[in-house]
Amino acid sequence: NYSSATAIRAGAREGKLRAVKKNVPSFVFEDLKSAPPSDAYKDIAVYAALSRPAEEMKKILDCTEGLENRIKAIARGVSGYDELVAKVTTKRYISSRVRRILAAAVLGIDEELVRRSLKNKLYLNVLAANKSRAEELLPVFAHSDFPALLRRSDERNLSPRARECYDVDLFAEDVYAFVTRTPSRGGRTVFV
């Protein structure tokens, strides 16, 4: 019997970690126990819904059929993110779609950026690598069609389109570091 990712996140959010423990690997469970609250992100997401003009929201992928107006109208009268998502959600506008649109509003990701990024070879952003395995991995990355970002100097190998996408990645990392009160890696690979 397995839980869905949504159920696992809900259990962790509600502090029901014992129920989650049997459905995740031990290292994930340890991360969940020490995960910071997401309140700051939720406040930023509501702020983004309030501050972004409807015309700008309309440019977000999947924000169609007047959904931007619904989000903005409801955002004016809610006490927080969870209430906003709940009130915007309908059979037509499922909650995962609403949350994705709010995340895109926070990060400034519009449909054009998504479409351009999907049409281009971007990059391999190596988040972490074991020092003992790095020598095996480096030749693989060297023969890839995508530039591997292992150190800051590798950024110069990015095409203009890839750089545009990478800048959003870095911004997302900075937002995450801010809302979780953790240090930002600045896009650098961590060798462990």
What are these regions (language model features)?
Residues 1-192:
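Active-site cores that bind ATP or allylic diphosphates and position pyrophosphate for catalysis
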